[in-house]
């Protein structure tokens, strides 16, 4: 019974942590990675992975939802493309 309560509490805390956050995913030319990353706050560090075209990278991060309106135009100006914004259910 105690384990079940702890499990529910963990999931509730995770849902509360995600309440004011969104995830951003974008494509970035490899040459523009540093300027784009410098704009991004994140929980730790953004996730970066190579696309099939090695001159491009996929970048994913979590940010405060209130910052997105100002952040997306700056990311675009720094070279990011194909920017996706999506809600989070939980952050553990």
Regions found by a protein language model. Name each.
Residues 1-92:
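Small-molecule-sensing regulatory modules
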């Amino acid at each position: 019974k105690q384990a079940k309560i702890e499990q529910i509490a963990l999931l509730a805390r995770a849902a509360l942590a995600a309440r004011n956050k969104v995830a951003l995913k974008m494509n970035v030319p490899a040459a523009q990675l540093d300027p784009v990353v410098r704009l991004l706050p994140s929980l730790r560090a953004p996730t970066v992975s190579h696309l099939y075209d090695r001159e491009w990278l996929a970048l994913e991060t979590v940010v405060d939802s209130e910052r997105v309106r100002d952040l997306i135009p700056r990311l675009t100006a720094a070279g990011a493309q194909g920017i996706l914004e999506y809600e989070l259910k939980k952050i553990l």
